[in-house]
Swiss-Prot record:
Gene label: arnB
Subunit structure and binding partners: Homodimer.
EC top class named in words: transferase
PANTHER family in UniProt: TRANSAMINASE, UDP-4-AMINO-4-DEOXY-L-ARABINOSE--OXOGLUTARATE AMINOTRANSFERASE
Identification of the protein by name: UDP-4-amino-4-deoxy-L-arabinose--oxoglutarate aminotransferase
CDD domains per the UniProt record, alphabetical: AHBA_syn (cd00616)
Transmembrane helix among keywords: no
Gene source species: Shewanella sediminis (strain HAW-EB3)
Length: 388
């Protein structure tokens, strides 16, 4: 069995993808242009959404959608603390209050039973998070939003390739997908906004490029329209072609990528049943198709004899990468020290979030792995846990 370093992740890039990037470099048009437009069309075909806007990151998209919805001082936005901190940062930077909702103890996603008690007259938005490649139970969450007249924006950073009740995430509602380097499909850095709302899409497209009345690339004139004027002050959040082209080939292979990740993840799950104190996340029982963005386990220190951080350090000694997705937002230094002074008392019951934040560990998972790599990781964990 190889002892070469096995990283936590590696992008699913092949030689054709590399050649496509080189073609863009040779073309003379490397910023936002035809390849960004092609990527948007590819996302539309895959998801079935009505509108797609390519962006420099999903975080940029979150900033813009919060702005368009008018989120600001005095408003509350309900979102999990068990997520990457970008959403919470954007809410905070706009002067609104992030209201942290707890998650299910075993799949680490929130639901209506946890969200509804947190709704107040100040609640202006709900941002639930698809987690690790599994889908939220969307119908119930959208029904809740409609009942209270509160919009829902899906944080779908982990969910490109995931399905809910037979339809790709993005088919309905409004979503933000991440195309960061660690994601199942990557542009190195980037994100995609999808929606069924034409007016919302038009605002996002305008705001992402200085507030101009055209995109960075005018698709009819094959270049920037010289008469373009600023309709409203905007930002510089467009995705360049040199990034967009990288994902085009991956989007053609997304079914293959998802299938390989699924096979590897299920092999992990089979083998880990024999390792005491190590528990993978549960798979939700409602109808959905997991795209296995992450392979997450929980490390029970009482059974394993060591904690999560110690396991990660020991795996590193075995030339195996591992990570944490995520340290709960409300436990991060800034929010630990400033939340109460800025926003008042934090949500009282975040028990499942806090418990899992101390135990979760992400194991290597990427399409270039094989079953022997999975077996190597599980064997290392078993030996570490057995030897304490």
């Amino acid at each position: 069995m190889s002892n070469e370093f096995l990283p936590l992740c590696r992008p699913a890039i092949d030689e054709q993808d590399i050649s496509a990037v080189a073609d863009v470099l040779r073309s003379g048009w490397i910023t936002t242009g035809p390849k960004s437009a092609e990527l948007e069309e590819s996302i539309l075909r895959h998801t079935g959404a009505q509108h797609a806007v390519s962006l420099s990151s999903a975080t940029a998209g979150m900033h813009l959608v919060l702005l368009v919805l008018g989120i600001g001082p005095g408003d509350e936005v309900i979102t999990p603390s068990m997520t990457w901190v970008s959403t919470v940062n954007m809410i905070t930077l706009l002067g609104a209050k992030p209201v942290f909702v707890d998650v299910d103890a075993d799949n680490l996603m929130t639901d209506v039973a946890l969200i509804e008690p947190l709704i107040t007259e100040r609640t202006k938005l709900i941002i639930p998070v698809h987690y690790a490649g599994a889908s939220l139970d969307l119908d119930a969450i959208y029904d809740l939003g409609e009942r209270y007249k509160i919009p829902v924006i899906e944080d779908a950073a982990h969910a490109l390739g995931c399905e809910y009740k037979g339809h790709p995430i993005g088919k309905t509602g409004t979503c933000l997908f991440s195309l960061h380097a660690i994601k199942n499909v990557t542009t190195a850095e980037g994100g995609i906004f999808t929606t069924q709302d034409a007016e919302l899409a038009a605002r996002i497209r305008r705001l992402k490029f200085h507030g101009l009345g055209v995109d960075a690339f005018d698709r009819e004139t094959q270049g920037r329209a010289p008469q373009a004027e600023v309709i409203e002050p905007g930002y510089k959040y467009n995705m360049p072609d040199i990034c967009a082209v990288l994902a085009l080939g991956q989007m053609k292979r997304i079914g293959e990528i998802t299938q390989k990740r699924t096979e590897l993840a299920l092999h992990y799950r089979d083998l880990l049943t024999a390792v005491g104190g190590i528990t993978p996340l549960s798979i939700p029982s409602y109808e959905h198709r997991h795209c296995w963005h992450l392979m997450i386990i929980r490390v029970d220190p009482l059974i394993c004899g060591l904690n999560r951080d110690q396991l990660i350090a020991r795996l590193k000694e075995c030339n195996i990468g591992a990570g944490i997705h995520f340290k709960a937002c409300h436990t991060q230094k800034y929010y630990r020290e400033n939340y109460t002074a800025k926003f008042g008392e934090i949500t009282k019951s975040l028990t499942n979030t806090e418990h899992n934040s101390e135990q979760i560990c992400s194991l290597p998972l990427f399409p270039d792995m094989n079953f022997s790599d999975v077996e190597r990781v599980v064997a290392a964990i078993s030996e570490i846990v057995g030897n304490k």
